A protein has these predicted regions:
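Domain-level signal for Mg2+-assisted phosphodiester chemistry and nucleotide/NA-binding surfaces
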Residues: 1-109
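Extended two-metal-dependent nuclease catalytic cores across DNA- and RNA-processing enzymes
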Residues: 2-7, 13, 80-238
């Protein structure tokens, strides 16, 4: 099984796209210093379970692309590590070194590793998913616990979380969200993303975002409904 010169898949055309660092944090949280063998086994086991003939593991190459759009992107994360002890710093360095070892092992076994300067793993995933028909890809499985990847879900694109051990697909979408899949971007715009330091509407979190979508519809519907007469300040902020 290999890519042809045209970049298309031959033989088994199902594709596994792995959020490389996201999956590695599974061992970071368990404080396991040496996890290369387990990491490789996990990836190959998932490829077998989902009958994927090609595996692409994605790595973050920085956030330049996103920071050019929004300079405050992830600015809140600097404080997270400023009070680290020397022992904690060494532990994290060991984690990253083992992550590099795992990547090399996977590459030596013939799996694709993709990392591009200025782009994060989900930027690359979005590009690959967008090009999947050109590459002759059949079914695609995204391996990440990051729910932002759900923006990519389609009839032939699904996500599996190694943290919750649950799948998110177009067929079980309503088990995970209280709004239709095409409202996912509206949800993110309203609620923002505190982890990435991206503000949403003042006073609007996930629950209130769901309520607004249920009552008014997508972002354009909400915009067209403004100004909305309400006693609630978060609605007045719209």
């Amino acid at each position: 099984m290999k890519f042809t010169d045209a970049g298309k898949l031959e033989d088994n055309n199902n594709l596994l796209i792995v959020d490389g660092l996201n999956v590695a944090f599974r061992w970071r949280y368990k404080r396991v210093p040496y996890y290369t063998n387990d990491y490789v086994r996990t990836i190959e086991s998932l490829a077998k379970s989902y009958n994927c003939g090609r595996v692409i593991i994605l790595a973050d190459g920085g956030s330049t692309y996103r920071k050019n759009i929004y300079p405050e992107y992830k600015a809140n994360r600097k404080d997270r590590y400023k009070d680290q002890t020397e022992a904690e710093k060494k532990e994290f360095e060991q984690f990253l070194a083992e992550f590099a070892n795992a990547f090399k092992r996977l590459q030596d076994k013939g799996h694709l590793i993709e990392k591009h300067q200025g782009l994060e793993a989900d930027d690359l995933a979005a590009w690959i998913v967008g090009k999947r028909k050109e590459f002759g890809v059949g079914e695609t499985w995204l391996i990440s616990s990051d729910k932002d990847w759900d923006l990519l879900i389609d009839e032939d694109v699904s996500r599996f979380s190694t943290v919750t051990r649950k799948e998110t697909t177009v067929h079980n979408w309503d088990e995970h969200y209280k709004f239709d899949k095409d409202k996912f971007l509206t949800f993110k715009c309203l609620a923002g993303d505190a982890g990435d330091n991206i503000p949403g509407i003042k006073g609007v979190g996930p629950k209130r975002a769901e309520q607004l979508i249920e009552q008014y519809g997508d972002l354009f519907d909400i915009y067209n409904a403004c100004p909305i007469d309400s006693k609630y300040k978060f609605i007045q902020e719209l």
